[in-house]
Amino acid sequence: MSVDTATLEDLGRELGEQIANSPEHKAFLEANEAVENDAEAQEMIREFEQLRHEFMLDREAGRADRESMREVQNAQQELHNLPVMEKYLDAQEELQDRLTAVNEAI
C-alpha cells in the first residue's frame, strides 16, 4: 500500500468519524430513535406501507386508480404530520444537506 493510499484511507476514516460526530447526524439518530419508540408513528408507518404495497401490486396488475393513489398520499401526509415524524424528516433533510455540502467539497 502506498503512502498516498494510506493517507487517503486515513482521511476517509477521519471524515467518517467527523460525519458521525456532527450535530446533524446526532440529531438524525435521536429523531430516528424517537420514531422507532413511538407506538402511534409505528402503527401509521405499518398502515402506510401496507397501503403503498397494495397500490404497487394494483399498479403492476393495471388495476390502480386515482382513488387508491389518493389514499396512499393521504396516509403519507397524515404520517408526516405527526410531530415526531416532522422532527425526523427535518433532521433527515438537515443531515442530507450537510452530506451534500461535504460531497461537493470533495
Regions inferred by a protein language model and the residue ranges of each:
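Acidic, polar-rich N-terminal leader regions of halophilic archaeal proteins
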Residues: 2-106
